[in-house]
């Protein structure tokens, strides 16, 4: 037996209810019966003629990093940006976000902490004023779709199969680090 949401195969986490088995490892994200795929809701997709603006220029090294990121993404490769806190990693993602949205693709930005979700949402809304930038975290779950979705790692369960580009920040921090359940939901 295998859960299609979290990948659990440990029988200790399965329970049978009226002849139907379901996974208890990820029950906090809603019940999913064995053999069923996570629910995929339709999402808004529109080709945006968006352009981001920053109130300051990127440094020459940041511009080189952006060019490398874009080269890898256009080749269909995953990218890891490893830099110190405050080095401008969020700004390095904006070119990629713009490129994907202009093609009508769906973009998500996941981060571990609620407060940072709200901060990133505000920064992205300033950089992309013509877009609907949505924050999805504790206390902000009424609207869950927009042009650009900024959410906590825990909220990724809502977006199974949605994102063409998923930017994950602070993957080395609690609660994502060493959490197999959140890793499975994100992938």
Q: What are the residue ranges of the model-derived segments?
A:
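N-terminal pre-P-loop "Q-motif" helix
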Residues: 54-77
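Residues immediately C-terminal
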Residues: 113-116, 142, 156-158, 172-174
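Interdomain "pre-motor" coupling segment immediately N-terminal to P-loop NTPase/helicase cores
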Residues: 1-45
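Inter-Walker segment of RecA-like/P-loop motor cores
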Residues: 123-160
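Conserved RecA-like ASCE P-loop NTPase motor core of nucleic-acid helicases/translocases
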Residues: 105-113
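Walker A/P-loop
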Residues: 74-96
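SF2 helicase catalytic motif II
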Residues: 158-187
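Conserved adenine-nucleotide phosphate-binding loops and their immediately adjacent elements
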Residues: 42-54
């Amino acid at each position: 037996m295998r859960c299609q949401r979290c990948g659990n195969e440990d029988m200790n986490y399965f329970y049978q209810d009226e002849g139907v088995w379901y996974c208890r490892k990820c029950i906090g994200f809603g019940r999913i019966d064995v053999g069923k795929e996570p629910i995929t809701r339709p999402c808004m997709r529109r080709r945006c003629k968006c352009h981001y603006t920053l109130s300051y220029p990127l440094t020459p090294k940041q511009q080189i990093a952006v060019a490398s990121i874009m080269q890898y993404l256009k080749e269909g490769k995953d990218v890891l940006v490893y830099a110190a806190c405050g080095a401008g990693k969020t700004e390095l993602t904006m070119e990629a976000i713009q490129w994907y949205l202009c093609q009508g693709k769906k973009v998500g930005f996941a981060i571990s902490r609620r407060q940072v979700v709200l901060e990133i949402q505000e920064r992205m809304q300033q950089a992309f004023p013509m877009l609907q930038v949505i924050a999805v975290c504790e206390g902000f779950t009424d609207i869950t779709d927009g042009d650009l979705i900024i959410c906590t790692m825990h909220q990724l369960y809502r977006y199974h199969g949605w994102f063409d580009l998923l930017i994950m920040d602070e993957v080395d921090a609690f609660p994502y680090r060493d959490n197999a359940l959140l890793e499975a939901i994100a992938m």
